[in-house]
A protein has these predicted regions:
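A conserved beta-strand element that flanks and buttresses the S-adenosyl-L-methionine
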Residues: 111
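A short, conserved alpha-helix within the catalytic core of class I
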Residues: 119-135
């Protein structure tokens, strides 16, 4: 698979996110928060579960995965299942360059939450081409 290339500014942005991951960051009111801790897919889980079932999705590439832990129990508060169990998936792969995680491979579905708004406009085309090449 072809690897996309970011612009100089895009690479600087990834480096900034690396620093945020390592050191955390401060909000306006000086509340310290660790970055990359939300599982952005959770609020949409019921709709996504239906889509995954309708299209027989068994493998997912989480593009820009951040702190998403697909194997951690409690993803669904009603069943206490992990995201992998809840969606009945066989395989999860992750990609997050800011966290030095690169498990990109062909998958039944590529999910991408809270990513594109952080990409420089000049890098969007190459990033989308990269995402599409991993969707089965």
């Amino acid at each position: 698979m072809k690897k996309y290339k970011l612009s100089k500014k895009g690479n600087q942005l990834i480096n900034m996110y690396n620093k945020m991951i390592d050191e955390g960051y401060f909000k306006v009111k000086a509340e310290e928060n660790l970055s990359y801790v939300n599982f952005e897919i959770r609020p949409l889980r019921k709709n996504i579960k239906k889509i995954f079932k309708d299209y027989n999705i068994k493998s997912v590439l989480d593009y820009g995965s951040g702190g998403s832990d697909w194997n951690k129990s409690g993803f669904d508060v009603e069943t206490e299942k992990s995201a992998k169990q809840y969606f009945e998936l066989d395989k999860i792969n992750k990609f997050d360059p800011a966290m030095n995680v690169d498990e990109r491979c062909l998958s039944d579905c590529v999910v991408c939450f809270d990513v594109l708004e952080h990409i420089f406009i000049s890098d969007v085309r190459n990033l989308l081409l990269d995402i599409f090449q991993y969707a089965n």
